[in-house]
Amino acid sequence: MKTGIKKVKLHVKKNDSVVVISGNDKGKEGKILKVFPIKSRVIVEGVNIRKRHMRPTQGQTQGSIIEREFPIHSSNVKKS
């Protein structure tokens, strides 16, 4: 009996140039920064940018709001 997580093969990989084919960022192009094969999601440069609220730490006494890319489903992109 096998245990563990099944490896999922995606049609794109890190550093591929892709175009978003559906969603709010449809038509945007970018390079893949990171791939999450288990969840079938990818992070594309300049796509799906959201604001993230950062908590104050010992190094920074004040919190901040930063903008960064969040993952989108791999079926929403195609190689260009």
Curated annotation (Swiss-Prot):
Record's Gene Ontology CC terms?
ribonucleoprotein complex; ribosome
Q: Give any GO molecular function from the UniProt entry.
A: structural constituent of ribosome
Q: Which UniProt keywords apply?
A: Ribonucleoprotein, Ribosomal protein, RNA-binding, rRNA-binding
Task: Answer yes or no on keyword Hydrolase.
Answer: no
Supply the PROSITE patterns for this chain: RIBOSOMAL_L24 (PS01108)
Q: Which domain of life is it from?
A: Bacteria
Q: Does the keyword Protein biosynthesis apply?
A: no
Q: Where is this region: Disordered?
A: 53-80
SUPFAM superfamilies in alphabetical order: Translation proteins SH3-like domain
Pfam families hit by this protein: KOW, ribosomal_L24
In its UniProt record, which GO terms are filed under biological process?
translation
Q: Describe the function of this protein.
A: One of two assembly initiator proteins, it binds directly to the 5'-end of the 23S rRNA, where it nucleates assembly of the 50S subunit. One of the proteins that surrounds the polypeptide exit tunnel on the outside of the subunit.
PANTHER family (UniProt xref):
MITOCHONDRIAL RIBOSOMAL PROTEIN L24 (PTHR12903)
Subunit structure and binding partners = Part of the 50S ribosomal subunit.
- Which family does the record claim for this protein? Belongs to the universal ribosomal protein uL24 family.
- What is the recorded name of this protein? Large ribosomal subunit protein uL24
Q: Which organism is it from?
A: Pelodictyon phaeoclathratiforme (strain DSM 5477 / BU-1)
